Amino acid sequence: MTRYVFRRLGGAIIILWVIITVTFALMHAIPGGPFTTEKKLPPQVKASIEAKYHLDDPVWKQYGDYLGGVITGDLGPSFKYEGRSVNDIIGDAFPISAQLGLLSLVVAIVGGITAGAISAMRPNSIVDYAVTVLSTIGISVPTFIIGAVLVYIVGFELGWFPVALWRGPSYMVLPVLTLAAQPMAFIARLTRSGLLDVYQQEYIRTARAKGLGSWTILTRHALGNAILPVITYLGPLAASLLTGSFIVETIFAIPGLGQYFVTSIYNRDYTFILGITIFYSALVVFLNILVDMIYPLIDPRVTTEEGTDE
């Protein structure tokens, strides 16, 4: 296990370096700069600002300085938020995105597994058809449309919940449901498919022959093996939800990482775009490694060491 972890960490460092390099190159390949949109900025003032942030240095030197900062944990200053570093902004915005993401993750997991299990326990029934149709709609319909529908019907027409900002539990309902809808539908499909396969296994037939009830078979024998594909899916899903959905945070005016990222693109805030990209990539890599380490604990047939399964 230790050798596997170190091997994965070594690969993760290479992946992050490639991501930093490619993103840095793309940012500097785009015409213009972070201060090009300033109206009638005097050349002397513009030159002074660029010198302050070392934007007048050769690109290779900027890359070396930035890479050195990343190694020490410094993601640099924000070009558009005067006096604030990228680390500070991430530190302020990430807890909000994390709260939104964690709540959405819990709703998606609980709702998806429950719906998939009920559907698999009653195949070809009305409940099964309803879950299948709803999960198909949930996967197919874009998140921004789901959000817009919830805002209009639940927020404006029914007036049950606020439709903007992030100030308390009632403000969380619509954003969480919007963000959880697609992964919940996908988890329901994965759970249903996995359970239908498991229910065909010999040990399930033996359990039924012994007179065990449906819920006992589900919870003690079937569900653990059926949700293995769900666990694999949770790594990238958790990273995506924890860093916040750009669309959801924009629709509901939530001051999380997603909204800051969208603003930074319009403002060409290079360091912030790079910082968010690095942060998001590191989180994805870390969570994928974590899921790979947890996977063998759930299914002993899976091993992380080469050659041990031969």
PLM region spans:
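Membrane-water interface segments at the C-terminal ends of transmembrane alpha-helices
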Residues: T23-A29, Y66-G68, V133-P162, A180-Q182
